[in-house]
Every structure is written in structure tokens, then in C-alpha cells.
């Protein structure tokens, strides 16, 4: 294994690899900011542009439907132009979308801005974790590949804070500044990422062996580790291990994603089917368990629980952002020590309990007309607990796991397919939550999410093997074993 040369313990995280992953993950801060700030902006958009609940649902969810398109395009795009330039493209799209939203003279223009930004989100959510995973060593891949989700949480918290302070501005100015200010960091990132190296795995897949090896030497902890990683990637790319050329023609090999969809969807091997099931399953359950309802509609949920003033609503919502960021940061430190599987099962188990408590608290509060103090406190504690349990496991592990389980030649488009499922579920929840609460009450909606989370726990327990500490090439071999051997790797959780 590349991280355990001659039986030595893995060295500390490579600083240059960490810098690369942080810069790539900044695009996730911008996306997170949009999610957080939209929860407050919609309160004022509804009043300023005289929109109804259905229009608000469409406005919040359309970004994710467009992100679906972006994510499906991102896999092939990143295989052709590279991971780095795909991040640049994502930044430019999000910048243009932010400018349109900041202008927003009417609902159609605002909607077009959300669509443009959504395309950028789709590109970013697919490529940032893949880039980080391909830069990182196996012993620190969980840390680096979880950075995008940590940055999403930081962005959400920033959005909640901006909501609180900009809400004091005149209404027609406040919400436009909330949405438009995201154009500035998008522009900075587009230039900043150009100073970062390309993914060494992508370069080697293109036959650019010398460039790929030079970058591996920069992001590895020793020359021996770099050489071992280099040989592993060459083998995965189908390059003769004895080849010492600087550049190799990759004739007949799938270097730009040709034929990959056939291998993924039409004629997958048993191993690829198993990878697809686990990767798409974890993306499905991440949003089907209701996290977007709390993040996007937090002010409305807390209003149902009994909080009335806008200042108090935004302050309590900031608490959601603090919990999310704190526990995501904790998860980044634990992923490579505790492992993906144990954290995931603990996380989802806690979510089931918290969602049940939230459903009960909101039901009691609504039945009493929002005048039960204990029901209000229970609802706030349960919402915070739900976000905390989500953030320490299911939140970051979804992106880490799906970026590392696909074989090298299928990784970019496999990851893009996972993001597509993720965005569909995000859009489904965000575009239906208000209608759902009208049909079965807000408390009933969270009881339903608790049931989904319980199903998710069983799915993860029986189907997801541990990948902690394994190189990407070793993970590929893990999924090629028969089902009994894979289940044997799981242990007793």
C-alpha cells in the first residue's frame, strides 16, 4: 500500500496536497453559501416579488435540477479538459448566476440566475471530491476528500450569518445583496485554481507520465511512496509497468470517457454493479432523509415550533449552521481513524432518533398553536441533533465514499452519476417540502424522514464495505471479490 512503505506508519498529511484540496474545495463554500443565504432570502423574495409557495419551491429546487444537468456533463468534461479546468468552468458559471440573482428585477430573471448557478454547482460537486481524492494518499484521503463537504457547511453558516445582518437593510436591497455577493469569491477561485496542479491520475490516463509523476512527487510524503502510487496508477490505466517514456500514446484506451457509459450502465460487470449500488444508494439516502428541509426551510420550521420574530428566527437558524460546521470538522478528523462504516452507522442511527423527536416536538407545538415552551425547546434541540448526526457521518462520507469506490477509468463519470442522483433527491425534497407539510403536517413530514433514515441504516449495514486506509486501486480490487468475501470485510460494524 502506498502509505505504508516498509511497514512504517503513515506520515502526516502532505501540505501541498492539503493546499490543493483546500483551493479546489472553495467552490463548495460558494455553493453552501447559496444554500444558507437562500433560506433567508426567500422570506424577503416572497414579500418583495409577491411570490407564492409553489414559486418558492421551484426557485429553491430548480438549482438542483440544473445541477443534475451539470453533473452529467461534468464527468465527460473533466475527462476531456481535466479536473482543474472543470473547476474553473464551475466557478465562472456560478459567478454569472450570482450576478443574475443579484440583479433579479423579476421572478423569471431570478429563476434564470438560479439555473445558471445550478449548472456550476453540478460541475463543482462532481469534480472537487474527485480532484481531492486523486491528489491524496490513501491514509489521508478521507480528510482531503471530505473537505468539499466541510466547505459546504462553512458556506451555509456564512449564508445564515449574512441573512441576519443583511435582513436589517431595506428589503429590496437586502435579499439582492445576499444573493449577488457570491460572484466575488467565484471570480477569485477561477484564477486561484489555475495555480494548482492537474490531477496526477488524470495526466497518467492521458499518457503524460512525466508530468503525472512529477506531481505525485509533490503530493506524496516520500519518493518511494510517489513511485509506488505511480506504478499503481499505471497498472490501473493499462500501461506497461516497464514503460519509462515521458509520454505514451494511449491509442485504443478510454482516455476521454469514450464507452464508459456502456461499462457503467449497459454492460456492467458484477463488481461495477456492486459499486453502482453502493455509490448511488448513499447519494439517494443523503437527501431522502430530509436534511435539505432543515437547511433550506429552517426559519419556517422554527416558526411552526413557536418562534415569531425574524431576528430570532435567523439567530436560531445560525445555530443550525454552527452545529453543521462543528460536526463536519470533527468528522474530517475521524474519517481516517475510525473508518467510514462505523461513523456512517452511528450517524444514521442518531438521525433516526433525532428526526423522530423533531416530528413529535413539531406535532405537539402545532397542536398547541405554537404556545408550548417545552415543545419549542424539543424541536430546536432535535433539529440541532439531526444536523449534528448528519454532519458527523452521512454528510461527508457520501462524497468521500462515492469519490473512491469507482475504478479509475470509470471514476469521473461514475462520480457524476452519483451527483446526478444526489441533485435529483435534493430537488425532490426542496421542491416538495412545503406541499408535503400542507398534506401531512410539518411533524408528519419528519416522521416520514425518520422512516427513510431507518431504511438507510439497514442498507448501509448490509451493503457498504469499509474502505479506510486502502488505496484507490485496492478498493477497486475489494469490489471485484465475490459478495461473501466483501461481507466478510465488513465485520460486525
Swiss-Prot record:
<protein>
    <recommendedName>
        <fullName>Probable polyol transporter 6</fullName>
    </recommendedName>
</protein>
<dbReference type="InterPro" id="IPR044776">
    <property type="entry name" value="PLT1-6"/>
</dbReference>
<feature type="transmembrane region" description="Helical; Name=2">
    <location>
        <begin position="54"/>
        <end position="74"/>
    </location>
</feature>
<keyword id="KW-0812">Transmembrane</keyword>
<feature type="transmembrane region" description="Helical; Name=6">
    <location>
        <begin position="177"/>
        <end position="197"/>
    </location>
</feature>
<keyword id="KW-0472">Membrane</keyword>
<keyword id="KW-0813">Transport</keyword>
<feature type="transmembrane region" description="Helical; Name=8">
    <location>
        <begin position="313"/>
        <end position="333"/>
    </location>
</feature>
<dbReference type="GO" id="GO:0005351">
    <property type="term" value="F:carbohydrate:proton symporter activity"/>
</dbReference>
<feature type="transmembrane region" description="Helical; Name=10">
    <location>
        <begin position="372"/>
        <end position="392"/>
    </location>
</feature>
<feature type="transmembrane region" description="Helical; Name=11">
    <location>
        <begin position="414"/>
        <end position="434"/>
    </location>
</feature>
<keyword id="KW-1133">Transmembrane helix</keyword>
<feature type="transmembrane region" description="Helical; Name=9">
    <location>
        <begin position="343"/>
        <end position="363"/>
    </location>
</feature>
<feature type="transmembrane region" description="Helical; Name=5">
    <location>
        <begin position="142"/>
        <end position="162"/>
    </location>
</feature>
<keyword id="KW-0769">Symport</keyword>
<dbReference type="InterPro" id="IPR050814">
    <property type="entry name" value="Myo-inositol_Transporter"/>
</dbReference>
<dbReference type="InterPro" id="IPR003663">
    <property type="entry name" value="Sugar/inositol_transpt"/>
</dbReference>
<comment type="similarity">
    <text>Belongs to the major facilitator superfamily. Sugar transporter (TC 2.A.1.1) family.</text>
</comment>
<feature type="transmembrane region" description="Helical; Name=7">
    <location>
        <begin position="275"/>
        <end position="295"/>
    </location>
</feature>
<feature type="transmembrane region" description="Helical; Name=3">
    <location>
        <begin position="85"/>
        <end position="105"/>
    </location>
</feature>
<dbReference type="InterPro" id="IPR005829">
    <property type="entry name" value="Sugar_transporter_CS"/>
</dbReference>
<dbReference type="Pfam" id="PF00083">
    <property type="entry name" value="Sugar_tr"/>
</dbReference>
<dbReference type="GO" id="GO:0016020">
    <property type="term" value="C:membrane"/>
</dbReference>
<dbReference type="InterPro" id="IPR005828">
    <property type="entry name" value="MFS_sugar_transport-like"/>
</dbReference>
<dbReference type="InterPro" id="IPR036259">
    <property type="entry name" value="MFS_trans_sf"/>
</dbReference>
<feature type="transmembrane region" description="Helical; Name=4">
    <location>
        <begin position="116"/>
        <end position="136"/>
    </location>
</feature>
<feature type="transmembrane region" description="Helical; Name=12">
    <location>
        <begin position="444"/>
        <end position="464"/>
    </location>
</feature>
<feature type="transmembrane region" description="Helical; Name=1">
    <location>
        <begin position="25"/>
        <end position="45"/>
    </location>
</feature>
<keyword id="KW-0762">Sugar transport</keyword>
<dbReference type="InterPro" id="IPR020846">
    <property type="entry name" value="MFS_dom"/>
</dbReference>
<comment type="function">
    <text>Plasma membrane sugar-proton symporter.</text>
</comment>
